[in-house]
Every structure is written in C-alpha cells, then in structure tokens.
C-alpha cells in the first residue's frame, strides 16, 4: 500500500510539473508580449484592436496589487507591495477583471507579474499605498494583508551572492523578505493568487523566484486552484508558471532547482543573443542555439531579447535604442525553434528610474498612435513595429516545424528554413548578402514580411520568387533599412 501511495504521489507531482509548463495558448499562437506599465483599460483595447488580430498569444502585465507610492513614481514602485488589494496606477479590480475577460474573449491570455518574495522596503514613517492603505515597512507592519514582524525572518543584508542563506533569507535590495515557510504567509499568498485565477488569468510570472526556497514555492503552486473554466480553460487546467531566476551558470542557487516547477527565465539567452547581434560573436555559431549553448530545455525556458530590468543595464543586452540590431535579434528569436517566446513593449527612458509616461498629476497616460500605428507619446511599443509583429505571425505560421537547411557564409550572414513553411535570412556583416538560397517553400512568389505586408494579394515590400526546387534569390544590402528577410506560407502572393 505504501509503495502504491508513493507511486501515486510521484505521478501526481510529475503531472503537476508538466501542467505548470502549459501556457494555454489559443490555436497556433505562441508569443507573449510584456505590456510594461500599461493601464488595464488600454490593454483591453489593445487585445481587441491589435494583439488578437495580429495573433499574439498572451500579455504579461505589471504587478496588480497595491504598492507603495514613491516620489516621482519610478517604475520600480510597482515591485514594493503593501497589500493584495487590486488597485494600482494601472487601474482597479473592476478594470482588471474587465481586461482579463475581454482579452480572453479574443484569444489573448493574461499572465500576472506576482511578488511572493517580499513586501515594500523601508520608508520614513507611515507609507500610503495606491489603494490608500497605510503601512510601516520599517516595523514590518502591513495591516492591509495583514502581515506583522512575525511573518518575516530577521533582517539581514545580502553581501555574498554565493551564500544560499543570504540569497534566500536576507532582504533583496532592502525589500522586507517574507517567510514563505509560514502557514499564515502561505495562506495569504495562495489567497491572492487564487483570486487572480478566479478573475480569469492564465498564469504568473514569479518575480525574484531564486530568493525563495523551491520547496516553499512548490507548496504554494500545488495549493493553487485550477484555472477558471468560465474563461475558456479546460477542466483541471493548471496555471502557467514562469519564474525569474537569474543564473549565469555558476550560481549557488541554480535555475535547475526551479525548472520542474514551471518555466524559468533564461537570462543567458538574452545576454548571448545581444552579444551575437552586437557583432561580438559571428552569427554562424547560432546554428546550435538553445540547449547546444547550455540553455534550459526548450519547454522549460522563457526566452527574451530584453526585459524591463536588463534593458536598463549596461552591457551586451540589446534594447530599443539599437533598433536595427534589436529587430534582427528579435526576428531570429521568433524564427528559431527554441523556448517560450516573450517580446518586450517598453516606454522611453533616460535613466534607470524613469517613470512610465504620466501627466502632471502623475497618472499614467494612454499610448497614442501615428497613422502607421506606432506609438508616439513616450511609449515605445516595440510589439507594434512591423518587423516584430510580422515575426509573431511568422512564428504562428511555422509552429511545430523543425529547423532545416541552415546556411551561413562562415561569418554573420545566415539563413534557415522552418520545415516547408518559413524561411529567414539575416545579414549582420558590413557587406551585401546576395545569394541563391534554399527557402524550402513551395514554388511561387512570397512577400517579405519584414519590409512590407501582404495586402489584398499585393506585397508592399520586397518579394521573392521561389523556384520549383525551393531556391530563391535573396538580397539584403548592407544599407537596407532592415538586415533580415522573412518569408512564410501565409504571405504567398
């Protein structure tokens, strides 16, 4: 009997782990966009007018629960919670619920950035939150939950990042570290997440996961409710979990401790793709991209060119400020068959603390668009760049196909096919790419979705004629606006 019970427990644990890697996408959709700091009402409209029609699979939204109000309203105040009331600068609970419903109705899932590791950092005196709740972080007093000093371990500072105790028990940049082994703390975190599940979300991005013991997170995840079938999820569907674990390869707390609980953010993907497209590595080395580079298995890796944190850091990571290289890197990211893909949608920043676009009363303003649909009032909206949303469509068109017919020039001109459904060529050299290449596509004329769009049977950009043998003439000039070309079966003229 004991052996049967043990086997059943192990079986259930394994099935739960696999379930938490399922993002619950509609149809062939398979790209998440992070609409960083957007208001809920604007996200709802964006789902209906742009994301749904363009085939995006889901949205990662900023933290939804009440946070401290910081002077100047820097973006990071959202990561300093003081209660689990659903009121932030992005909107209130009613607006959040309306957004989730409307996005689900057009096939766009919602994933919430959740803060389970900590509460707000120190604040002089009594802090006021975005829902009007008072707290005294310096005394570890958060009556809006309520949490008190007994719900936190003794305060200490992380001075040694190779010390597991410090990494998981001390305060990350001064933020009050919760005790996730406490029954009370666990119950409040589970209650918060279950409320979001009830409202229709598909899953969670778990902030600062490496600063929590994996066994505590496993308990919390296992205790969550199934997804809400009223929002189109099947019975017994588990929330998709992806966890922020920064692991450069030799960390005391490893990504491998979390990968079976859900997907894990693959930060080395971001760093290495930046290195390659900045010219520090030849693109020919990308043929073995993914696990060949020591990355996590594809189904366990949440992949991205940049995120809201590392786009603000110096180093190899690309961001919107290097648009030509950024678009090439994103095209490769979305074309190569590896990982669970997320693209960034930023606002403009001049320094690390720049707040989102706001009015004189420090209220977040809605994005505005020009005649081409690009954002113009402080929002960058990379997801609305044609070269990026076109590659979201490419990724949908080639889903479940393998990479084939890799070609390179021995340096930084590359091409490859996705089965017989798609083809990507990239030129990151300082001279033209002019070559007959195997596109693997059926014979015909194809619109390059990077330089233009297929509208009413006509291509507004470059086109390529594919011969009966699958070959076509590919030209990407060194002075072309974009350094890549993408063809797929849904863009056949």
From Swiss-Prot:
Signal peptide: 1-19
GO MF annotation list: alpha-amylase activity; metal ion binding
Locations listed in the record: Secreted
One GO BP: carbohydrate metabolic process
Pyrrolidone carboxylic acid modification, residue list: 20
Disulfide-bonded cysteines: 47-103, 156-170, 375-381, 417-440, 447-459
Positions contributing to chloride binding: 205, 307, 342
Statement: the UniProt record of this protein carries the keyword GTP-binding: no
Catalysis performed (reactions): Endohydrolysis of (1->4)-alpha-D-glucosidic linkages in polysaccharides containing three or more (1->4)-alpha-linked D-glucose units
Active site, renumbered: 207, 244
Cofactor(s) annotated in UniProt: Ca(2+); chloride
Keywords: Calcium, Carbohydrate metabolism, Chloride, Disulfide bond, Glycosidase, Hydrolase, Metal-binding, Pyrrolidone carboxylic acid, Secreted, Signal
One Gene Ontology cellular component: extracellular region
Keyword Cytoplasm belongs to the record: no
Record-marked site positions (Transition state stabilizer): 309
InterPro entries, per the entry: A-amylase/branching_C, A-amylase_C, Alpha_amylase, Glyco_hydro_13_cat_dom, Glyco_hydro_b, Glycoside_hydrolase_SF
Family to which the UniProt record says this protein belongs: Belongs to the glycosyl hydrolase 13 family.
Subunit architecture: Monomer.
The protein's name in its UniProt record: Alpha-amylase-related protein
Originating organism: Drosophila elegans
Gene it is expressed from: Amyrel
């Amino acid at each position: 009997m004991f052996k049967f019970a043990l086997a059943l427990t192990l079986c259930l644990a394994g099935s739960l782990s696999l379930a938490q890697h399922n993002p619950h996408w509609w149809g062939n959709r398979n790209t998440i966009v992070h609409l960083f700091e957007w208001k809920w009402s604007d996200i709802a409209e964006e789902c209906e007018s742009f994301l749904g029609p363009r085939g995006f699979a889901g949205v990662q939204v900023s933290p939804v629960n009440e946070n401290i109000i910081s002077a100047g309203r820097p973006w990071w105040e959202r990561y300093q919670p003081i209660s689990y009331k659903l009121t932030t600068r992005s909107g209130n609970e009613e607006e959040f619920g309306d957004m989730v419903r409307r996005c689900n109705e057009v096939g766009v899932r919602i994933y919430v950035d959740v803060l389970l590791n900590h509460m707000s950092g120190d604040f002089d005196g009594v802090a006021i939150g975005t829902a009007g709740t008072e707290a005294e972080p310096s005394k570890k007093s958060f009556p809006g939950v309520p949490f008190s000093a007994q719900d936190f371990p003794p305060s200490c500072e992380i001075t040694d990042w190779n010390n597991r105790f410090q990494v998981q028990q001390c305060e990350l940049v001064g933020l009050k570290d919760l005790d996730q082994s406490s029954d009370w703390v666990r119950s409040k975190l589970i209650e918060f997440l279950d409320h979001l599940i009830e409202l229709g979300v598909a899953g969670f991005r778990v902030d600062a996961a490496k600063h929590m013991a994996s066994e505590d997170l496993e308990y919390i995840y296992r205790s969550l409710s199934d997804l809400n079938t009223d929002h189109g999820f099947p019975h017994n569907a588990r929330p998709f979990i992806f966890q922020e674990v920064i692991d450069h390869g030799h960390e005391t707390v490893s990504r491998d401790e979390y990968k079976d609980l859900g997907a894990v953010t693959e930060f080395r993907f971001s760093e290495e793709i930046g290195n390659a497209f900045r010219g520090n590595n030849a693109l020919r080395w990308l043929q073995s991209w993914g696990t060949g580079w020591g990355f996590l298995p594809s189904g366990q890796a949440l992949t991205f060119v940049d995120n809201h944190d590392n786009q603000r850091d110096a180093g190899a990571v690309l961001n919107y400020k290097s648009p030509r290289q950024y678009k090439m890197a994103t095209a490769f990211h979305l074309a190569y068959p590896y990982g669970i893909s997320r693209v960034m949608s930023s606002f403009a920043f001049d320094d690390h603390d720049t707040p989102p676009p706001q009015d004189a009363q420090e209220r977040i303003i809605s994005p505005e668009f020009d005649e081409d649909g690009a954002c113009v009032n402080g929002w960058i909206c990379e997801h609305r760049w044609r070269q990026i949303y076109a590659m979201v469509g490419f990724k949908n068109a080639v889903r479940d196909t393998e990479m084939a017919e890799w070609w390179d020039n021995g340096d930084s001109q590359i091409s490859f096919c996705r089965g017989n459904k798609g083809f990507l060529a990239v030129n990151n050299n300082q001279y033209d790419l002019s070559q007959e290449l195997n596109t693997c596509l059926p014979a015909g004329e194809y619109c390059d979705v990077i330089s233009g769009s297929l509208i009413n049977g006509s291509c507004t950009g470059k086109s390529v004629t594919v011969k009966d043998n699958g070959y076509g003439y590919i030209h990407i000039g060194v002075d072309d606006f974009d350094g890549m070309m993408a063809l797929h079966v849904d863009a056949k003229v």
